[in-house]
């Protein structure tokens, strides 16, 4: 069922946010922990957005499928752009759709969709796909300006 699956995803996302906060509060952060946390975030994003893509392929129009695909790939590109920029000494903490926003914009409508409101998830995917593309553009433009300053 959709609703229990979404509730489990919300639980995992919340616990993921909590473990990073707890590590910072206890001054137990480190390079390995940061690397592992970022890597596991990508796995979680892949599972969440991949699941939505599979659902869209089974039940939605080609447009909704494309929006889900843009959200999946664009989400990875948003994260990669920041990591790559930081690896060459540039700042990249810009964009209107950071990970938390992307997850909220997806999971709440997915929950409502699971309760039987069919148009909510497709609408959220269309909005999120646009926000993801804007965020990718913002990050690329920001890094380009810094690199050519």
Where are these regions (language model features)?
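Conserved G/P- and acidic residue-centered "switch" motifs that form tight phosphate/ATP-binding loops
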Residues: 16, 37, 75
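Hydrophobic alpha-helical transmembrane segments
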Residues: 1-3, 13, 47-149
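Basic, amphipathic juxtamembrane/active-site segments
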Residues: 6-10, 20-66
